[in-house]
């Protein structure tokens, strides 16, 4: 997965709620590594599934993003989580 594309896709589609790894919808479920691990979402597959299908306040991106774009943004989120969103 291409992290440059992942960053662009994140900026265009995710940053309005998840800038800096935060979560404006459900504050305790951030995109930080510890929270992703706590909620069983610290994998490209889990992040990709949530982006694809949505959950609770998060909309589904299935019709808006191609599968390869979802894979790129999931890889980007994992990389940023690993780096503590710095």
Curated annotation (Swiss-Prot):
Protein's UniProt name: Cytochrome c6
The keyword Acetylation belongs to this UniProt entry's keyword annotation: no
HAMAP family: Cytc_PetJ (MF_00594)
Record-linked SUPFAM superfamilies: Cytochrome c
Family to which the UniProt record says this protein belongs: Belongs to the cytochrome c family. PetJ subfamily.
Biological function: Functions as an electron carrier between membrane-bound cytochrome b6-f and photosystem I in oxygenic photosynthesis.
Post-translation changes: Binds 1 heme c group covalently per subunit.
GO cellular component, one term: plasma membrane-derived thylakoid lumen
Any GO MF annotation of the entry: iron ion binding
Entry-linked PANTHER family: CYTOCHROME C6, CHLOROPLASTIC (PTHR34688:SF2)
Keyword entries, A-Z: Electron transport, Heme, Iron, Metal-binding, Photosynthesis, Thylakoid, Transport
Species this chain originates from: Anabaena variabilis
Single biological process term from Gene Ontology: photosynthesis
Subcellular location(s) per record: Cellular thylakoid lumen
Major subcellular site: other
Binding of heme c, residues: 14, 17-18, 58
Subunit and partners: Monomer.
């Amino acid at each position: 997965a291409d992290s440059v594309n992942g960053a662009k896709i994140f900026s265009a589609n995710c940053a309005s709620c998840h800038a800096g790894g935060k979560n404006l919808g459900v504050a305790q479920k951030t995109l930080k590594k510890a929270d992703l691990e706590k909620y069983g979402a610290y994998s490209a597959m889990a992040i990709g599934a949530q982006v694809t299908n949505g959950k609770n306040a998060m909309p589904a991106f299935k019709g808006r993003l191609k599968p390869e774009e979802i894979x790129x943004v999931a890889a980007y989120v994992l990389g940023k989580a690993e780096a503590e969103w710095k």
